[in-house]
Amino acid sequence: MVPVDLELQRVLVERMDVATTRTQPKSLSLPNILTYARIAAIPVVIGCIYAQSILDYPLWLRWVAVAVFIAAGVTDYLDGYYARIWNQQSAFGRMLDPIADKLLVASCLLMLAADGIIHGWSLWAAMVILCREILVSGLREYLAALRVSVPVTRLAKWKTTIQLVAIGFLLAGEAGDMVVPVVTQIGLLLLWASAIFTMYTGYDYFRAGIHHLIKEDEG
């Protein structure tokens, strides 16, 4: 049997949790704060790579960029995890989360292209990824106006994971090659792999989108 004082304490804690949930804006929930942190990490990563490659600052800045990028990638997992287990899912979070992902990936790809790490034929892989993200974002926005939800598939999650791992290797760049000589090459191979996944998942989204568009025109 639970003592009275412990039972009273439990009830008070539960009521405080309910009150906090009611008074705290959903935009300030922990999952959304983690998403904000991911967006805030972007200028730090870009600044480190710019300072090292363009301004010729020390190579250790690349490791700082990699560390911040990894932390940003971890928040991509944690925000969804905490939103589910704490029941803090919100329309604002569902809107902002994919935007944060695309900003992070696009910014890093553009910086790596400017740095010369992504060059030659590998630029095509980067362009495939960027164009797909733009097109899918436009499709999602249009379908949202029709109140049609396009869920993220498991394959799309794998695509994002491969993208983030590829970019992590490429951010290490010359600094990584000094530790393991093939770091940049591994990053470029993973970039092509993510581009292939990107095209396939993009096709899935467009097939689902076109299906809804045809139904809308016929209805």
Where are these regions (language model features)?
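Alpha-helical transmembrane bundles and membrane-interface segments of multipass inner-membrane proteins
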Residues: 2-219
